[in-house]
Amino acid sequence: MNRLPLFLFVLPFIAFSQANILNATKVDEIGKQTDARIAADNDGPLAYGYIDERDILWSKVVWEFVDLNQKINLPYYFPIDTSNISSDRRSLFDTLLRGIRKGSIKNVYSDSFFTSKITGAEIDEKLVNVRLNGDYSDTFRIKTQDIEGYMMKGMWYFDKRLGELKYRLLALAPMGKDVLTLGLPDIEDEELYELFWVFYPETRDILHKSKVFNPKNVSQPISYDHLLNARRFNSVIIREENVYGNRKIADYIRGNALFQLLEADRIKESIRNKEIDMWNY
């Protein structure tokens, strides 16, 4: 009686993680892509349409925090153990880091305004800490399981040619603890820090190749590029473009998390209402 539910659980995992399993004649062929599959997957992300500046009737840039503790955001967090997962399925953090290491993502920045680039060595300083302890050394690394969220920068704009409100993701940054505090129980630092920033259009090719588990149809995985462009995540607005130097909500509403959330909802609602207001005479 207990074998059937277990079989139903294992089957989707096998179907997703082991390509060509139905056509394989020997074990070595399991997981290898067929020529037809390679040809079908040899595509790129859907190109953005050209937007004329004169067609943008209104726009606003916002910074949002995506909390990976929320269930809807879990596809960006998992998998954290890749020993039994196909090579094209990685967490968003591992995908970005692999793209940086291999040179697919050439430009990495220290902030969301792209004012200064950082090198691979500077990224390692934020991800790896070697602590000397007498004759021994302990190495601490920020891994996928240490990433607690993402900061995303995007623009909402009203396209007067199409007559609708649209969103374009501009940049994103993984958020984690300070690597210097890892392994130090005496230091309580719950602050999350931006590890690095990437310009989203430059990451689309590699995010398109990396797949996300699709619980509704395991034979048709979704790419990170599709997921992000569709805004399949829950977020809280942290900052908006404003006259006060783009200050954060926490800078003018201090010490009250509830009021900060209410202010974030107010900003989100004002953006949503902008499309309706455009059609009012």
What are these regions (language model features)?
Residues 164, 169-182:
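Extended serine/threonine-enriched, polar tracts that run as long, contiguous segments within proteins
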Residues 18-160, 179, 200-281:
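A domain-level signal for the mature, folded cores of soluble proteins
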Residues 188-206:
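Short secondary-structure subsegments characteristic of cysteine-rich extracellular domains
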Residues 8, 154, 176:
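Residues that line or immediately flank small-molecule/substrate-binding pockets and catalytic motifs
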Residues 161-163, 185-188:
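Short consensus segments that form the blades of beta-propeller domains
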Residues 145-147, 167-169, 193-195:
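Extracytoplasmic
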Residues 1-25:
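Bacterial Sec-dependent N-terminal signal peptides
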